[in-house]
Amino acid sequence: MTVEERSNTAKVDILGVDFDNTTMLQMVENIKTFFANQSTNNLFIVTANPEIVNYATTHQAYLELINQASYIVADGTGVVKASHRLKQPLAHRIPGIELMDECLKIAHVNHQKVFLLGATNEVVEAAQYALQQRYPNISFAHHHGYIDLEDETVVKRIKLFKPDYIFVGMGFPKQEEWIMTHENQFESTVMMGVGGSLEVFAGAKKRAPYIFRKLNIEWIYRALMDWKRIGRLKSIPIFMYKIAKAKRKIKKAK
C-alpha cells in the first residue's frame, strides 16, 4: 500500500519542514481513528527536532521525504520556540518516546502486534522484554538495526509477522529512509522513527529526570550523560541562526 496523505490539520512551516499544529491528545485520537477506519494505507509519523530540521535544510531529498509523512510533529522545545519566533506558534511539543508509549497503550488495549527495528541485538531484545512486561497483551517481534536499506530479508520477516506498528530506531536519516523505502510492502501499519527510544526502554540509557523535561532542557541532560552527543550540540546555534535569518526575511517581505 502507500502512506496516508498529509493530514488536514493546520501546518506550520519551519525552514521548509511542514509541521502539523497538533497535540498529543489529538495524535492519540488520530491513531485510534486510523485503525477504526481500517485503512489499507500506512500512517507514517515523523517526530522532528531541531537537529532533523537542520539536516533537512541541507539535504533536499530528505526534506522531500519527510514532508511526505502523514504527520510531522515537534519533538523538541527548540522547534516550538522557533515557531513562536516566526509568528506561527505550534500548540505543543510532542516527544517521540511519549508518542511511542501512547501507541503501545493503544496496542495493548487492542491486542495488536508491534515490531521493534533498531539498536543492537542485545538492546532491542532487552527493550522487547521490558515492554512485554509492561504491555502483556501486545505481540512483539524485533530485529537489530544494523542492516542495509535494501535488505529484503528483514522486510520479509516483518511482513510475515503482519505488525500493526513498526518502530524504527536507527537514528535519522536512516530510519525515515528505511520507512519510505519499504512502506509500500506493508498495509494498515503505523510506522514511526523513534531514534534512541529503544535504548531508553531497554534501560541502556536513562531518560532525563522530570525537572529537565519540565524546563524543556532534556537535550542538555542527554548531552551531559552521553559525551558522543556533545558534537551534535552545535546544531542548536546553527538552527537558531537559521530561524533568526528566516525571521528577518519575513520582516523584509512585509
From Swiss-Prot:
The keyword Glycosyltransferase applies. Its EC number is 2.4.1.187. It catalyses: UDP-N-acetyl-alpha-D-mannosamine + N-acetyl-alpha-D-glucosaminyl-di-trans,octa-cis-undecaprenyl diphosphate = N-acetyl-beta-D-mannosaminyl-(1->4)-N-acetyl-alpha-D-glucosaminyl di-trans,octa-cis-undecaprenyl diphosphate + UDP + H(+). GO terms for molecular function: N-acetylglucosaminyldiphosphoundecaprenol N-acetyl-beta-D-mannosaminyltransferase activity. Signal peptide: none annotated. It holds the Pfam family Glyco_tran_WecG. Pathway: Cell wall biogenesis; poly(ribitol phosphate) teichoic acid biosynthesis. Keywords: Cell wall biogenesis/degradation, Glycosyltransferase, Teichoic acid biosynthesis, Transferase. GO terms for biological process: cell wall organization; teichoic acid biosynthetic process. InterPro entries: TAB_Glycosyltransferase, TagA_TarA, WecG_TagA_CpsF. Catalyzes the conversion of GlcNAc-PP-undecaprenol into ManNAc-GlcNAc-PP-undecaprenol, the first committed lipid intermediate in the de novo synthesis of teichoic acid. Belongs to the glycosyltransferase 26 family. TagA/TarA subfamily. This is N-acetylglucosaminyldiphosphoundecaprenol N-acetyl-beta-D-mannosaminyltransferase.
